[in-house]
């Protein structure tokens, strides 16, 4: 008896289907199609720490404390944490970077889970403090939460408000000094006090305990002396670093597994 090739193929496929159904019935389990490697893997997005520089300072100027803090964090968190610094004019660029980091499945859009899994910390000095709040507001429109914002002698830009912290921010802190032609805002407030905790508005006075800030440009030390002193104050950045670390993954102790 002769069988066509098409008939044999159909017969083989039917036999395979009967076998699969039989195995499923015996085990009580439905046999699912096998996934390709990585199909159900959803990697966790990194924690994100972004800093903004004040004035017209370059994003990688090593003299400035914001850049130094970022370098220290990169050294101690080589994986699992994305640390970057930006000029205060690059809020939109920083937002795009965040969207890229959160898109863990690389499908070009953020799911609710990807948004809610965000762990974002933003800090900045002077106009960088304004940029900190501006980025947090942009992320609020995207439905993305922010763990912490840190403003150091924050100065509003072009009359834009940098004192009202958006409701997507969990915690916010403000360090300021009130002297000189350029000085920070003395009081930040939560747009929604039930969702945002203001850790404090902390005032600093460098008249009694002046700082040299020898590495900073002479014009900063001359024209905006107090504003520069708060930026180069190691106490400020030690406090900021402590708050940031509290919201980052714990570094395993040496020798631990």
PLM-predicted stretches and their roles:
Residues 2-15:
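Bacterial N-terminal signal peptides that target proteins for export
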Residues 22-25:
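C-terminal motif of bacterial Sec signal peptides marking the signal peptidase cleavage site
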Residues 27-30:
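Bacterial signal peptide processing site
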Residues 38-118, 222:
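Active-site catalytic motif of lipid deacylating hydrolases and related acyltransferases
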Residues 58-66, 87, 91, 124-132, ...:
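Solvent-exposed, acidic/flexible segments
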Residues 69, 73, 80, 98-192:
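Serine-dependent carboxylesterase/thioesterase catalytic core
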Residues 167-257:
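C-terminal catalytic-base region of ester-bond hydrolases, centering on the histidine
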